[in-house]
Amino acid sequence: MIYPDEAMLYAPVEWHDCSEGFEDIRYEKSTDGIAKITINRPQVRNAFRPLTVKEMIQALADARYDDNIGVIILTGAGDKAFCSGGDQKVRGDYGGYKDDSGVHHLNVLDFQRQIRTCPKPVVAMVAGYSIGGGHVLHMMCDLTIAADNAIFGQTGPKVGSFDGGWGASYMARIVGQKKAREIWFLCRQYDAKQALDMGLVNTVVPLADLEKETVRWCREMLQNSPMALRCLKAALNADCDGQAGLQELAGNATMLFYMTEEGQEGRNAFNQKRQPDFSKFKRNP
């Protein structure tokens, strides 16, 4: 795709709806080679459940194998949240999040791997809250364009959860060990400027310009060699390839932790809108 002048990069985008069969996401494609996956659960700040993740996996696979698509945007519906992580209301006692048939999943780990291995750039378009598992999802994307109202942070230790895979190791690679420990251990929230200063996002733009600027970045990439982008993504990923094995091990540890009374105390407190009481659990040497 060639854009003869700067103004063309900001031309209005024509989206075609490809959402048929999806319940939790919207899936769209532009006429100039961009796919957009939108988590469409604004009533819960775009928290994901197993169905949400299953549909995102299906949409990303479709975009990967569509040779008309060169770049993929991942975003959340509305301007209040990109994604607030796993929906604690469907988090079960047996190692994951329950689907409608009662089966427990941590399939968001599959989606993380899919983003990493997709040979096309994946761009997070973040407005509002990008928290917990949603924060990890934006980190997994190749680029992050943030609105000036974006809020970032981890909540795991507050809700009896953690991401010891890419959520910890890749974060440390991005922001450094000390800052990653602060983000995880204290569960504070950070505004868009703080995230930019840490290197968590690529740029911050006014909320009103978020999609326009994200599309511009996508169109700039569409002008470049797709094979070069593919090889560069693989090369940059190779620097952290050992983290893929860590993600598998840590995912299993998370599932086991969800089965414990300590893990369930965090979830229950969140759902009951109270402070968790972890004082009854031993701080073993």
Curated annotation (Swiss-Prot):
One of its GO terms (cellular component) is cytosol. Inhibited by sulfite and nitrate. Substrate binds at residues 45, 84-89, 97, 129-133, 155, 161, 258, 273. The keyword Lyase applies. Changing Y97F: Loss of DHNA-CoA synthase activity. CDD domains: crotonase-like. Keywords: Lyase, Menaquinone biosynthesis. Belongs to the enoyl-CoA hydratase/isomerase family. MenB subfamily. Homohexamer. Dimer of a homotrimer. This is 1,4-dihydroxy-2-naphthoyl-CoA synthase. It comes from Escherichia coli (strain K12).
